Amino acid sequence: MDELPEIIIETLKKRGVTELRPPQKLSIEKGLMRGKNLVVSSPTSSGKTLIAEIAMVKHFENRGKTLYIVPLKSLASEKFNSFKERYGEHGLKTALSIGDFDKQDKFLDSYDLIITTSEKTDSLIRHNASFFRNVSCVVIDEVHLLNDNSRGPTLEILITILRQMLPSAQFIALSATIKNDELLSKWL
């Protein structure tokens, strides 16, 4: 665990975590902290969120922003509360942007971590939100929704646009149930 950012080590100690789980170790081996794009497919409660946290803290230390995309407002609120509690004392400013789809949300420029839904991200892109110029990490939680008939095409287009807008950003896709993770990994 010595290679982890100090903020992560402190946070894990407070939570009583003394060692990483296999998916977390594998993600580090595959380049998590070197900015490599990753698809993390592992069971529920196996530590996928911590993988995203390690990346977002690493980007925070390098003055980059992380865009954390979730499918539901309730999940966005849950992540917001959790991350704010864990990392607020370390100076990482967390924002929740799930509301009005007809504005730019300029306030997001002053935040390090922006948690939002796919639909709100789409709106922020269409309104040319200025914070995007500093996004260096994009986390897509529940990426298996790409296989969903109703939400999948929209999510696929959103990821494609983000990859074009942010060609040097690190993309991390998280799922417990994705079936075609190797194909998705090649695409990212």
Walk through the language-model features, giving the residues of each.
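Conserved P-loop/Walker A NTP-binding site and adjacent catalytic elements of P-loop NTPases
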Residues: I9-T11, R15-L188
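Conserved ASCE P-loop NTPase core motifs with emphasis on AAA+ ATPases
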Residues: M1-T11
